[in-house]
Curated annotation (Swiss-Prot):
Residues 1-141 form the KARI N-terminal Rossmann domain. Binds 2 magnesium ions per subunit. The lineage of its organism: Bacteria, Pseudomonadati, Pseudomonadota, Gammaproteobacteria, Enterobacterales. GO terms for molecular function: ketol-acid reductoisomerase activity; metal ion binding; NADP binding. This is Ketol-acid reductoisomerase (NADP(+)).
C-alpha cells in the first residue's frame, strides 16, 4: 500500500532489509509474470478484482487456498493461468520448517478453466520447490479437493477438536482439584509433545509411548469417543460438501465477522486461556502418562476425520495430510500462546 511505503512501516523495513523490491500495486503487478495472492479468504474477491485489471496478458495467478475459486465462484480472465500451492500448515510454520532446512507437505493444483497454455502444473511444481515442499512431499490435487479437505480438517481434528478438547480437559482437571497452572501447561504443551510422535510414526508410535495398560485405556476411550462424535463429524462433512458451511461463513464476513469475533472473545475469556503460568519443567514422558485422554482424543479425531473424508470421495493422501500430518503444526501454535494464537493464525 502507498501509505505503508510513505510511512516506511515495519513490513516495509523488513522487506527492504531482505532485498525485496518494494512498490505499490500499480507499479509492480503489470510487469509480473507470476502474482501470488496470500491475502485472507474474505479479502480475495476485492483483491482479485484489482489484480485482474493490472495483470499483463498471459501471466499467472497463484493461490495458497482455493476457497475463492471453489466456494465464492470467482471467474478469472481466460488468458491468466491460475494455480495453487497449498502447504498443509499455517504460514508461520511454512517459514519455520524452511528455515530448519525442511518443508511441509504441500498440495498443488491447476484450475482447469484457466490453463490455456498448459504450463500451470510446471509453475506450481517450481513454486512448491522454492518453499521446500518437495522435501516433505508434494501431491497433485484439485482446487475443489483441497478446499473441501482443508475445511473438514480444520473444523474437526485440526482446530475444532483441539480447541474443544483443551477446554474440556482443563475443566476436568480443575474439577478434580489439580493445580490450575500445571493443568494448563500439561494441555497447552501436551498437544505439541504428543503430536510430535505422530510426525515420526503416526498413531502407532503415539500409542507406543504409553504403557500396556494405558494403551488399552486409550484405545477403549478412543472407540467410545468415535461412537459419540461420528454423527457430528458426518454433519460437518455434509455441510462442507454441500457448501452450506461456506455460505454461512461468507454471511458472517458481510456482517463484519460478528460471530467469529464473538467466539474468539468468548474463548479468550475462558479459564484455560487465563490460567496462571507453571514455571517448572514437565518431563516429556509425563505428557503421555498424564495425557491418556488427550491421546485417545487425537486417535479418535484423526481416524474419524480421515474416514469421513474418504467416504466423501477425497483421496487418501489428501485426507491424511488434513487429518494427521498437519496436526503437529497446528499444535505448535497452541504451545506458543494457547488457543488465542491458533485462532489468530488459522
Amino acid at each position: 500500500k502507498k501509505n505503508s511505503i510513505l510511512k516506511k512501516n515495519h513490513s516495509w523495513m523488513n522487506a527492504i532489509k531482505n532485498n525485496f523490491q518494494v512498490d505499490d500495486y500499480e507499479s509492480l503487478i503489470p510487469n509480473a509474470d507470476l502474482v501470488i495472492n496470500l491475502t485472507p479468504d474474505k479479502e480475495h474477491h476485492n483483491v482479485i478484482k484489482i489484480l485482474q485489471q493490472l495483470m499483463k496478458k498471459n501471466s499467472c495467478l497463484g493461490y495458497s487456498h482455493g476457497f475463492n475459486i471453489v466456494e465464492f465462484g470467482e471467474k478469472i480472465r481466460e488468458d491468466i493461468t491460475v494455480i495453487m500451492v497449498a502447504p498443509k500448515c499455517p504460514g508461520t510454520e511454512v517459514r519455520e520448517e524452511y528455515n530448519r532446512g525442511f518443508g511441509v507437505p504441500t498440495l498443488i493444483a491447476v484450475h482447469d478453466a484457466n490453463d490455456i497454455h498448459k504450463q500451470g502444473l510446471e509453475i506450481a511444481k517450481a513454486w512448491s520447490f522454492s518453499i521446500g515442499g518437495h522435501r516433505a512431499g508434494v501431491l497433485e490435487s484439485s482446487f475443489i479437493a483441497e478446499v473441501k479437505s482443508d475445511l473438514m480438517g480444520e473444523q474437526t481434528i485440526l482446530c475444532g477438536m483441539l480447541q474443544t478438547a483443551s477446554l474440556l480437559c482443563y475443566e476436568k482437571l480443575i474439577t478434580d482439584k489439580h493445580n490450575p497452572a500445571y493443568a494448563a501447561k500439561l494441555i497447552q504443551n501436551g498437544w505439541e509433545t504428543i503430536t510430535e510422535s505422530l510426525k515420526h510414526g503416526g498413531i502407532t508410535l503415539m500409542m507406543d509411548r504409553l504403557s500396556n495398560s494405558s494403551k488399552i485405556r486409550a484405545y477403549n476411550l478412543s472407540e467410545n469417543i468415535k461412537k459419540i462424535l461420528a454423527p457430528l463429524f458426518q454433519k460437518h462433512m455434509d455441510d462442507i460438501i454441500s457448501g452450506e458451511f461456506s455460505a454461512e461463513m461468507m454471511k458472517d464476513w458481510k456482517n463484519h465477522d460478528q460471530k467469529l469475533l464473538f467466539w474468539r472473545q468468548k474463548i479468550k475469556n475462558t479459564s484455560f486461556e487465563t490460567a496462571p503460568m507453571y514455571n517448572k519443567k514437565i518431563p516429556e514422558q509425563e505428557y503421555y502418562d498424564h495425557g491418556i485422554l488427550m491421546v485417545a482424543i487425537l486417535k479418535s479425531g484423526i481416524e474419524l476425520s480421515f474416514e469421513k473424508m474418504i467416504n466423501a470421495g477425497i483421496i487418501a493422501e489428501s485426507a491424511y495430510y488434513e487429518s494427521l500430518h498437519e496436526l503437529p503444526l497446528i499444535a505448535n501454535t497452541i504451545a506458543r500462546k494457547k488457543l488465542y494464537e491458533m485462532n489468530k493464525v488459522i
